[in-house]
Amino acid sequence: GHLDVVPAGDGWTETEPFSGEIKNGRIYGRGTMDDKGPMVAAIYALAALKDAGFAPSKRIRLLFGTNEETGCGDMSWYVSHGGELPVYGFTPDGEYPIINGEKGILNGTYSRKLHQTGDYRLTKFEGGAASNISPAYAAAELQCPADAASKISADKVTVTPIEGGIRVEAEGIAVHGSTPEQGENAIGRLAQALNQLPLTGELGDCMAFVAERIGMEVHGESLGLAMRDELSGPLTLNLGVAKFEQETLSLVFSVRYPVTLQYERVYPR
């Protein structure tokens, strides 16, 4: 199992994210289910076996990972430095009934430097905290004509005049990046809102690409990535992080592809 967690994020209502407070028999906090709580349960399970007098015929070990959420670099280091791997193992990082497979994961970054021209100039575009979280909030700022605000009309999007332009904010529903269909992606919603503006040049092309080829889709249909199998269902695409720095827009995404498909087939697409 693993002890690292996804970013705490905003919107905690019961407790602070790392308080570990117990209320009505429940522990609240980031990682209580994924995966600190299950790791503690595994320790107690071994203790229960020992107290019951169970004598295993094979050695039992616990491995505590610290980098599962962002690539398992800790395990690569462990193996390359002589760490022992199990003959048989399982991880208490799932649900009941037992999960015996996991989709492949392909993380990447799409970056494009924008040589901006025309009356609309992007100065800020940001949202999300990690590739494996569907973001609940994203915002952009543009230098543009005063009437730009009237050109955007979209649900869960707020446009506010600022000096020399506008600020556009989009709301979503945050969920884990492995199940983006259960949420609403604020970055995709923001791109669709900005695509209503008469953007020109590379800025217009880039925003149209994000809005029309990704947008609120979660299976990569418009990117030509849609694929599925009977065992694990469809490929999913999560747009997790957006950042605009030094005239470059970067989008960090996470693809989960069906268990029966090979990386070599998915990556070229």
Identify the residue ranges that each predicted region occupies.
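Small-residue-rich helix-loop
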Residues: V266-P268
